[in-house]
Structure formats: C-alpha cells, structure tokens
C-alpha cells in the first residue's frame, strides 16, 4: 500500500469528509495568525519596550524636579511661582506619556450631536465599527443591539437592489457601446447577430401566440389525491427550519456565552457581556470593550463563531420566509386575476371566440359606470395601510421583473429551442358542462387562460396587450365592497400598478388540459372506470391541450361594433359561424391518462349552419361520412325559406356611436337615483332604437331528438 493509499484509508477511517470544511477554516485561521504574528510580533515588542523605558524615565525625571522645587528657596517663598512650575511639570509628564490628546478628546464638546449620532448609526448597520463614539449607558447599549439586528438585513437588501440597478445600467451602457461599435464597423457578423436576436424575439412572441401553442407539443402530467410527480412531492415535503426555534437557540447561546464571559472577565457584568457578544457576532466590532484574559481568547473565539453561524441562519431563514411570502402573494394575485378574467370572458365553449372588438368595447362601458362610484372617506390609518400595501406590492412586482430579466438574459446562453410545455391536470379542477348533443369535461380555469392568451392576437397596440382586460378587471374590483385587511388592499394596489401588464406578459401562465367527449346516440352509453381509480369517460375521448384546440376564426357577423353581441357574447345576429369544412382532425394524443382508447385521431363532423328568422338561408350542407342519428334528426327539422325577398343582407344593428344619451328626470325614486349614481346612465336616458332583426339562440335539437327517440321506443 502506497503512502497516498494509506492517507486515503486514514481519512476514510476518521470520516474526514464530514468535517473537512471546518478543518479548512481552522487552518486558514492558523495561517492568518502566523502571517500577522510574523510581521507584528517583533515590532510590538520593541514598541512596548520603548514605551516602558520612556515611562520609567519620565517618572524619575518628575521625581527629581519635585525635589528641586522643594529645595529651591525662591519657590518656597513664592507660592504662585511654585504652582506655575508644578503645572508645567504635570503638562510635561502628560506630553511624554502621550496622554494630552486623550484628555483633550474627553474634555471637549460631546460627540452626540445629530451628525455624530447619524455617523454612529451608520457604523452599526454597515458593520464598519470605527469605535468612536461609543455608548456607555445600559439603555444605549440595548438600543444598539436591536438597531443593529434590524438594520443589517435591511441594509443588505438595499445593497442588493442598488447593485441590481447599477448592473442593469452598466449592461445598458455596454449594449449601447456595442451597438455603436456595430454601427461604426457595419460588419456582416454584427448584422447577423442583430438578425438572430430579432428572429429569436419573434420566435418567442410566436410561442406565446395562439398558433405557437398549437404547434408546440404539450405533455400532460396527471395529478390526483395521493398521486403526483415525485419531484413535486419531494419539494413539498421539504419544510424549512422553524424560525421561532432558531431564534430561541440563538437567545440560549447568547445567554450561555455571556455567562462564560462573566466568569472569565471579573470586571464584566452580565448586561455588558451580552452587549459585547451581540456586537461581536453582528460583525460590527466597536472596540469599546476588550478581553483582559489572553489565555481564554481561543474559547471566546469559538463561542463567537458558533453565535455568528446561528445569527446567519436566522437571517437566512427570515429572508427565505419573506421571499416565499412575496411569491405566495404574487401567485394568489395572479390567480385572482385569472379568475376575474374567466368571469370577464365566460361564454359557451361551443361558440367561436369573440373578436378583439368585444375586448376593447366592454371595458369602456364598465369604466363609465365605475367613474360614478362615490369615493369612500378613509381615515389616516386606512390611508397609511393603503400606502404600505402599495409599497409592498411595488417591491413584489419589481422583484419579479428583476427575476424575469435575469431569466431572459440566461436564456440567451442556453439552447435555442425550448423544451415542450408541461401542463398539469388535477381531479378537482375538472368539471362537466353540457351543450346540446355533446358533453365535455373541461377545466374551468382553462377558458380564462385561453382567453388571456388570445389577447396577443387582438388589434391592440404592442406592449399593451393586457391593458383593456385590466381595465375591465379594475372596474369589477371597484364595485366590490372595500375591505380593511392587508391582503385585499394589496390586491387592489396590485391591479393599479402600472407594471402589471408587463408582468402578465412575462409570466408563464399555467396551462390546464381539456378532455372532449362526443356523445354517440347510435349505441348504448358505456361508462367505464379505470382499475386504478381514474375518471370514467362517456363515448370516445381524446385528450388535448386547451391551447391546441384553438382554431383561427375570422368569420363573424357583419355587425362588428354592436354593443350587445360583442360585449356579452351571448346574442348572435347571424347564422352560426363555424368553420365551413367537411371535417378536421385533432392532433395525436400526448400520452394523457384520459386517452383510454386506441384511436390516434378523432373525426369531428361538420358544424351545420342553422338559419335564423330574418337571415338569408345558409349554403346547403355537404354530405357527411359520419352522421349520427341526432344530426339526421336536426337535418329533418330544418326548413329553409326559399323566398328571394328575404335573401337580403342582414340589417346593421345600432352601435354605441348611434346612441344619443339624454338625461331623464327620475323624480323621487331613490332606487333609480342610486342606479344612476353607480351606472352613470339608465335605459331611460337613451332614445328608442330602431327596430332590428329578431334574434334567437340556437336550439341544438337535443330535447327534440330525445323526445322523438322516446316516441319511437
């Protein structure tokens, strides 16, 4: 066995790997001790020897002068001259012992002016610790302890924010310098890099769009009670160390160390020992109290080292808890925004997407009502709470923006193509909703996500894709009763923040899956249950991502600026505008737990164009290869009017620009007056609109087919 093998065997025997870092710290400390001792020991011994010899010489000379003064007859008879000679001797003694400056500092004006006190406070939270001035009273030392413990973390956070701002400014200056350099050189390489960055930017925008989400594969990860991803379960089980226990451990260690200091230092009291220990572990080190027992300095150093580790642990736990609290508040606010967005865009899942005009029209109507809401009188403490909530919200949003900027910078150095998106499905998020002949199990929140994602395709100025949606959500929030709790005020300030739109553009929204089931009445409805307890299905199911089911639809009624049709999305003034194609294919399933059958694709029959009263007849339907009995019954019930007089262009409905508002006296009706105060306008304030074409909702024929089926049976 070689020498290296023996050393390696011995290290494994004593388990050196578990505490080698501590040994390295001790070795580094010993190296520093040797280094400083080498250069300071001899010089300090010489300086102390000179000081001792000088002190002995001064003492001997002072004694000789006193003897001369006592023997001198002139000085014996003249008391004033004798006093003056004695004062000169004392001054000479103080100058020789270098005590004049120290006496002058103690006898001058107090250093505890406003500027001096601010200088001392700055020494504490910056951990500089010049040692002048220092506190001498017990009250001042107690204030020093708490001020330093609270000020040091705050100052570190301030330095972090300032460093991030300076780093961003330096980065912008560097980009500008590189840009100017590229413009001056105008080389092909710089042009290629510029085009590459632009293409990458356009690629990211395409990914966030509706078409990009269709093209990217989406892998569905299943979650259920007691069954989830192992990494997520491990992350959930990792609980941080309790902060109260850490603080109790720190307090116990401070008391124990202070007691040991009182034993080793006879002149110290317990309060002074606590003050010295806390000032030491906070790395301030004012130097107003020193050890008088050099033999115990090593043990004192070990006590301070353990206390410093405990204090650092407490600071880290508190910082992590604050960061998690900020992240939790941000996630809850984003979730509320998504829920409110779902309420804004709630509609029938079988009806086509609303055009961008509906998104831009509705917020203005709601803003008119919101501006007439009377302001609530709030007191000083309520206003202070609003101000505090606003500051906390600004800090949360600013931190998220900085994190997103860092992530965007790091993404440029990673691979160019991103990994597939991962969507999560939970059992509690799925609901069942029916519409006529079809039944679908869909995720309720997926509509809000899909509608928010569709805003990127709306005809709104770039950089303000969420502006109209936020205006509508703000109007909804204003009508809610105001609460005085901090969370409600923070959410209100969250909506009012000007950077919220940018946050929504940069936040990766959670995508949930939609499971579509087509009911086939030709056979029995079979309900199967998975042996492992998964969800039952009806008919033939195919799992697909919510984002992947979105199809571009530019066919809508000609009344594009109608308030009723596009604000509420529930009235249709034209025949149903589904894509006029024979059939289309849903893409292949992505290994979802809901895809139980062996079919790779599912054929969806053609959507029929159903005539409405006052509308021209739709084009004749094409022959269907896959027609269910329900579709056949619907075709038999449809009777198209061939009268050429009604084959006219649909009459254009009144829009917001055609309405003339006028104020109508309401009399003494308090309800109408309150309604006008809240809404701004009432139906009585408008002229009677011209008669338009009658409207009706589409009857899917489901009840009729069920009645006919029961009759035939």
From Swiss-Prot:
Gene Ontology CC terms, in alphabetical order: plasma membrane
Disulfide bonds: none
Localization in the cell: Membrane
Keyword Transmembrane helix tagged: yes
Residues modified by glycosylation: 53, 77, 98
Intramembrane segments: 112-132, 267-287
InterPro entries referenced in this protein's UniProt entry, alphabetically: 2pore_dom_K_chnl (IPR003280), K_chnl_dom (IPR013099)
Keyword tags: Glycoprotein, Ion channel, Ion transport, Membrane, Potassium, Potassium channel, Potassium transport, Transmembrane, Transmembrane helix, Transport
Residue intervals annotated with topology Cytoplasmic: 1-15, 163-242, 319-713
MF term (GO), any: potassium ion leak channel activity
Main location, first listed in the record: membrane
Membrane topology: Multi-pass membrane protein
Gene Ontology biological-process entries: potassium ion transmembrane transport
Bilayer-crossing regions: 16-36, 142-162, 243-263, 298-318
Gene3D superfamilies: 1.10.287.70
Membrane among keywords: yes
Similarity comment text for this entry: Belongs to the two pore domain potassium channel (TC 1.A.1.8) family.
Protein name: TWiK family of potassium channels protein 12
Biological source species: Caenorhabditis elegans
Protein's gene: twk-12
């Amino acid at each position: 066995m070689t020498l290296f093998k023996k050393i390696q065997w011995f290290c494994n025997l004593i388990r050196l790997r578990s505490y080698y870092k501590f040994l390295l710290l001790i070795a580094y400390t010993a190296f520093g001790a040797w280094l400083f001792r080498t250069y300071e020991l001899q010089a300090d011994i010489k300086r102390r020897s000179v000081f001792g010899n000088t002190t002995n010489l001064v003492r001997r000379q002072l004694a000789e002068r006193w003897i001369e003064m006592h023997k001198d007859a002139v000085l014996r008879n003249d008391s004033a001259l004798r006093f003056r000679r004695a004062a000169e001797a004392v001054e000479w003694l103080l100058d020789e012992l270098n005590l004049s400056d120290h006496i002058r500092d103690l006898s001058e004006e107090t250093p505890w002016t406003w500027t001096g006190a601010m200088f001392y406070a700055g020494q504490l939270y910056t951990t500089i610790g010049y040692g002048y001035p220092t506190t001498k009273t017990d009250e001042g030392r107690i204030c020093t302890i708490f001020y330093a413990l609270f000020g040091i973390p705050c100052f570190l956070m301030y330095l972090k924010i300032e460093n991030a701002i300076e780093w961003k400014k330096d980065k912008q200056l560097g980009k500008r310098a590189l840009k100017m350099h590229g413009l001056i050189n105008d080389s092909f390489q710089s042009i290629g890099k510029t085009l590459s960055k632009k293409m990458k930017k356009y690629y990211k925008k395409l990914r966030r769009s509706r078409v990009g989400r269709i093209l990217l594969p989406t892998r569905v990860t299943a979650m259920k009670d007691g069954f989830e991803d192992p990494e997520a379960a491990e992350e959930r089980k990792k609980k941080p160390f309790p902060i109260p226990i850490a603080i109790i451990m720190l307090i116990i260690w401070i008391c124990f160390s202070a007691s040991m200091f009182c034993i080793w230092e006879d002149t110290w009291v317990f309060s002074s020992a606590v003050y010295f220990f806390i000032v030491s572990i906070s790395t301030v080190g004012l130097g107003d109290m020193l050890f008088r027992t050099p033999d115990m300095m090593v043990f004192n150093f070990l006590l301070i080292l353990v206390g410093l580790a405990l204090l650092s642990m407490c600071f880290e736990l508190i910082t992590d808890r604050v960061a998690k609290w900020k992240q939790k508040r941000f996630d809850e606010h984003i979730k509320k925004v998504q829920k409110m967005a779902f309420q804004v865009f709630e509609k029938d899942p079988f009806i086509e997407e609303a055009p961008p005009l509906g998104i831009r029209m509705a917020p203005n109507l709601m803003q008119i009502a919101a501006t007439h809401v009377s302001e609530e009188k709030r007191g000083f403490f309520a206003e202070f709470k609003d101000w505090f909530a606003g500051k906390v919200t600004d800090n949360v949003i600013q931190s998220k923006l900085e994190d997103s900027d860092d992530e965007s910078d790091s993404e440029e150095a990673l691979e160019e193509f991103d990994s597939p998106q991962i969507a999560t499905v939970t059992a509690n998020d799925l609901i069942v909703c029916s519409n006529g002949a079809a039944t679908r199990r869909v995720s309720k929140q997926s509509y809000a996500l899909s509608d928010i994602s569709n805003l990127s395709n709306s005809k709104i100025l770039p950089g303000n894709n969420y502006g109209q949606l936020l205006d509508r959500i703000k109007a909804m929030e204003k009508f809610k009763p105001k609460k005085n709790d901090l969370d409600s005020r923070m959410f209100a300030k969250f909506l009012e923040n000007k950077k919220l739109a940018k946050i929504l553009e940069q936040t990766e929204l959670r995508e949930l899956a939609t499971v579509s089931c087509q009911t086939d009445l030709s056979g029995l409805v079979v309900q199967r249950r998975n042996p492992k307890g998964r969800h039952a299905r009806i008919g033939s199911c195919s799992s697909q991502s919510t984002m992947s089911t979105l199809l571009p639809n530019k066919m809508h009624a000609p009344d594009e600026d109608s308030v009723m049709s596009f604000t509420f999305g529930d009235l249709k003034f034209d025949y149903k505008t589904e894509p006029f194609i024979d059939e289309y294919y849903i893409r292949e399933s992505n290994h979802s737990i809901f895809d139980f059958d062996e079919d790779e694709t599912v054929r969806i029959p053609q959507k029929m164009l159903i005539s409405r009263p006052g509308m021209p007849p739709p084009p004749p339907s094409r022959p269907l290869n896959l027609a269910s009995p329900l579709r056949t019954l619907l075709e038999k019930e449809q009777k198209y009017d061939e009268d050429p007089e009604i084959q006219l262009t649909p009459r254009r409905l009144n829009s917001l620009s055609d309405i003339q508002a006028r104020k109508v006296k309401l009399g003494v009706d308090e309800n109408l007056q309150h309604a006008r105060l809240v809404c701004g306008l009432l139906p009585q304030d408008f002229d009677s609109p011209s008669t338009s074409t009658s409207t009706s909702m589409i009857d899917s024929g489901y009840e009729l087919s069920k009645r006919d089926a029961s009759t035939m049976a």
